[in-house]
């Protein structure tokens, strides 16, 4: 008695019912590195430390008069954030994903070597410049590089005040800030949080809709920019915890602890998320594959 061979239809159904692993997550834009200069690397650590130092020195004034203190320190925070993005981060459009490597033939390699040799010979033939004279091309290149950074920095600052501040003000109200009172405190706190969280995001990613969908979905890979924004939000969230407690301390008034938490969150997030054990990773909210397999069995 011969056994019947399995039909190809059954084999196809069995193959289609097998669990398929989820596709690997790919961000629309790669994680952002700090610029590879000694100044950028040094200032990327000095900047969060300077923000915390300013907060510590002005904390008593913040407790005494939150509105006046937040209003007075807002221009300095804007200047520090613009300096930070210009010194440490690449502007939007300057970092592009690397194209796939194409096979290079021996002839192409020889041509490239010849071109490099020709360039070296041209550099050797150049006459030395006279002392006291600067090359015009170098000055023009420096001015163009400064303009390429200053323009997106100012645009990011404008968009931060026009768009991010109203959105964060609304979110503060939705999460419990007073609606009919303390309006100045709410708007100024939102402005400080917007400068901390949004300035670098807008400077680096511009108005790319795919990137901003990932930002609102908490699906960005970890880097200094995303870490600073996420740290600002989490710090403000945890900073609101002491407000309803009955400790009767003057620093518990709204929005002192929220603003303090936002500053600490930005400093910690921007430093920690650029470390080697977190850089490039992202939060995953999907269930584990093993749990899905158990439910289907």
From Swiss-Prot:
Residues 127-140 have a biased composition (Basic residues). Pfam families: PIG-F. The chain crosses the membrane at residues 44-64, 76-96, 157-177, 187-207, 225-245, 253-273. Residues 107-126 have a biased composition (Basic and acidic residues). Pathway: Glycolipid biosynthesis; glycosylphosphatidylinositol-anchor biosynthesis. It comes from Aspergillus fumigatus (strain ATCC MYA-4609 / CBS 101355 / FGSC A1100 / Af293) (Neosartorya fumigata). One of its GO terms (biological process) is GPI anchor biosynthetic process. It is a multi-pass membrane protein. The keyword Membrane applies. This is Glycosylphosphatidylinositol anchor biosynthesis protein 11. Acts in the GPI biosynthetic pathway between GlcNAc-PI synthesis and GPI transfer to protein. It is found in: Endoplasmic reticulum membrane.
């Amino acid at each position: 008695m011969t056994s019947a061979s399995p039909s190809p239809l059954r084999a196809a159904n069995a193959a289609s019912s097998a669990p398929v692993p989820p596709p690997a997550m790919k961000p629309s834009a790669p994680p952002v590195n700090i610029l590879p200069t000694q100044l950028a690397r040094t200032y990327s650590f000095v900047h969060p430390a300077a923000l915390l130092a300013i907060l510590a020195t002005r904390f008593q004034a913040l407790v005494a008069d939150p509105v006046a203190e937040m209003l007075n320190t807002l221009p300095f925070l804007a200047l520090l954030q613009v300096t930070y993005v210009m010194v440490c981060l690449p502007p939007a459009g300057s970092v592009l994903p690397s194209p796939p490597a194409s096979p290079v033939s021996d002839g192409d390699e020889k041509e490239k070597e010849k071109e490099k040799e020709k360039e070296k010979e041209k550099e050797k033939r150049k006459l030395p410049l006279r002392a006291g004279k600067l090359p015009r091309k170098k000055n023009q290149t420096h001015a163009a590089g400064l303009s390429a950074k200053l323009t997106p920095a100012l645009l990011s600052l404008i968009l931060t005040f026009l768009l991010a501040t109203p959105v964060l003000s609304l979110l503060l109200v939705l999460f419990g800030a007073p609606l009919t009172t303390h309006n100045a405190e709410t708007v100024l706190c939102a402005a400080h949080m917007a400068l901390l969280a949004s300035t670098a995001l807008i400077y680096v990613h511009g108005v790319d809709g795919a990137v901003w969908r990932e930002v609102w979905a908490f699906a960005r890979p970890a880097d200094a920019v995303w870490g600073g924004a996420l740290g600002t939000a989490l710090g403000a969230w945890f900073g609101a915890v002491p407000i309803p407690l009955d400790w009767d301390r003057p620093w518990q008034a709204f929005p002192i602890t929220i603003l303090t938490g936002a500053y600490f969150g930005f400093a910690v997030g921007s430093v920690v998320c650029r470390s080697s054990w977190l850089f490039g990773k992202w939060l995953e909210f999907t269930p584990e594959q093993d749990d899905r397999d158990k439910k289907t069995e």
